[in-house]
Curated annotation (Swiss-Prot):
<dbReference type="InterPro" id="IPR029063">
    <property type="entry name" value="SAM-dependent_MTases_sf"/>
</dbReference>
<keyword id="KW-0949">S-adenosyl-L-methionine</keyword>
<dbReference type="InterPro" id="IPR050078">
    <property type="entry name" value="Ribosomal_L11_MeTrfase_PrmA"/>
</dbReference>
<comment type="similarity">
    <text>Belongs to the methyltransferase superfamily. PrmA family.</text>
</comment>
<feature type="binding site">
    <location>
        <position position="157"/>
    </location>
    <ligand>
        <name>S-adenosyl-L-methionine</name>
    </ligand>
</feature>
<feature type="binding site">
    <location>
        <position position="178"/>
    </location>
    <ligand>
        <name>S-adenosyl-L-methionine</name>
    </ligand>
</feature>
<dbReference type="Pfam" id="PF06325">
    <property type="entry name" value="PrmA"/>
</dbReference>
<feature type="binding site">
    <location>
        <position position="200"/>
    </location>
    <ligand>
        <name>S-adenosyl-L-methionine</name>
    </ligand>
</feature>
<keyword id="KW-0808">Transferase</keyword>
<feature type="binding site">
    <location>
        <position position="243"/>
    </location>
    <ligand>
        <name>S-adenosyl-L-methionine</name>
    </ligand>
</feature>
<protein>
    <recommendedName>
        <fullName>Ribosomal protein L11 methyltransferase</fullName>
        <ecNumber>2.1.1.-</ecNumber>
    </recommendedName>
</protein>
<dbReference type="GO" id="GO:0032259">
    <property type="term" value="P:methylation"/>
</dbReference>
<keyword id="KW-0489">Methyltransferase</keyword>
<dbReference type="GO" id="GO:0005737">
    <property type="term" value="C:cytoplasm"/>
</dbReference>
<dbReference type="InterPro" id="IPR004498">
    <property type="entry name" value="Ribosomal_PrmA_MeTrfase"/>
</dbReference>
<comment type="function">
    <text>Methylates ribosomal protein L11.</text>
</comment>
<keyword id="KW-0963">Cytoplasm</keyword>
Length: 316
């Protein structure tokens, strides 16, 4: 029987996406996230309240490797890669441990984290292996969480989806920067966007996004490509959405202002509370006005508008 190895990394919440992506680059066949924030204040679609869970600053990223991979080498490589980033991000006191799993344990451990989740009023994310019947008006996003890059249930993704519901009315051109799983592009298509252009610097993410898009019918209007933020992009957009780290977000703001049409929107998520002022000041200096600010725990999402009419805009 084939066996698998489970590598657990405990890290500050801000480092979730970074650590997950590094583990995938180092050969993980899947990544699961355990985050106490996912249980705070949540109610499932049947009205059952989740048990109270103490909110922690740290999350656990669990990566799965076949037994043909030497996880001690993976651990050493991961430590070295993360050590290079200590000036860029406070990851906290890293804790790394490994466990051997049988094939059936791998399957059970993997899938137990993921169930259909109603994320917004209209959008429900469903694991690709699940049979799910949508209710009237419910839009389904099929994802394969085994490909990592998020399951769509992280607070930053949830708020990005809420923001897309808020600004999309149909017929828009959308740029999805740092697409990861492709969930925001798929949602944009379901919400009526005419054309979506998705970019990611990571070739693995480009492949993952394309595979997730193919799980959902009618997504021919989504175009995925490798790209470094918005460098070299010449496509004018009604909406630009980026759910990435705040220190990276500020580097796309000038290009976003260049590409967003008048009265268009820039949605920025993935902003830890300590970085909020930095992001807001950068966006406002470029000429954007803050229209909506969402908060969940320590995470922030901002919807900025490119407009000359600032009446009704927050701070306008």
């Amino acid at each position: 029987m084939e066996t698998w190895q489970e590598l657990k990394v405990t890290v500050k919440r801000e480092g979730e996406e970074l650590v997950s992506n590094l583990l995938i680059e180092l050969g993980a066949q899947g990544v699961a996230i355990e985050d106490s924030m996912d249980y705070v204040g949540n109610v499932d679609r049947f009205g059952e309240i989740f048990p109270e869970v103490e909110q922690q600053e740290e999350i656990v990223v669990t990566a799965y490797y076949p037994d043909t991979v030497d996880v001690t080498v993976v651990e050493a490589d991961l430590q070295a890669r993360l050590a290079e980033l200590t000036d860029f991000m406070d990851l906290g006191e890293l804790k790394i441990g490994t466990t051997a799993l049988a094939e059936e344990d791998w399957a059970d451990n993997w899938k137990k984290y993921y169930e259909p989740a109603r994320i917004t009023h209209d959008l429900t994310i469903v694991p690709s292996w699940t049979d799910y019947e949508a209710t009237a008006g419910e839009m389904i996003i099929k994802l394969d969480p085994g490909m990592a890059f998020g399951t769509g249930t992280h607070p930053t993704t949830k708020m990005s989806l809420f923001a897309l519901e808020q600004v999309l009315r149909g017929g828009e051109t959308v740029l999805d920067v740092g697409t990861g799983s492709g969930v925001l592009s798929i949602a944009s298509s379901l919400l009526g966007a005419k054309e979506i252009f998705a970019y990611d610097l990571d070739d693995v993410a480009v492949r993952v996004a394309q595979e997730n898009i193919e799980l959902n019918p009618g997504m021919e209007n989504i175009h995925v490509a490798a790209g470094d933020l918005l460098k070299g992009v010449e496509i004018e957009a009604d909406v630009i959405v980026a759910n990435i780290l705040a220190d990276i977000l500020i580097h796309l703001i000038d290009d976003a202002y260049r590409l967003v049409k008048d009265e268009g929107y820039l949605i920025m998520s993935g902003i830890i509370k300590d970085k909020l002022d930095m992001v807001r000041q950068s966006a406002e200096s470029a000429g954007f006005f803050l229209e909506t600010h969402m908060v969940q725990g320590e995470w922030n999402t901002c919807v900025f508008k490119k407009t000359k009419d600032i009446s009704g805009v927050i701070g306008g």
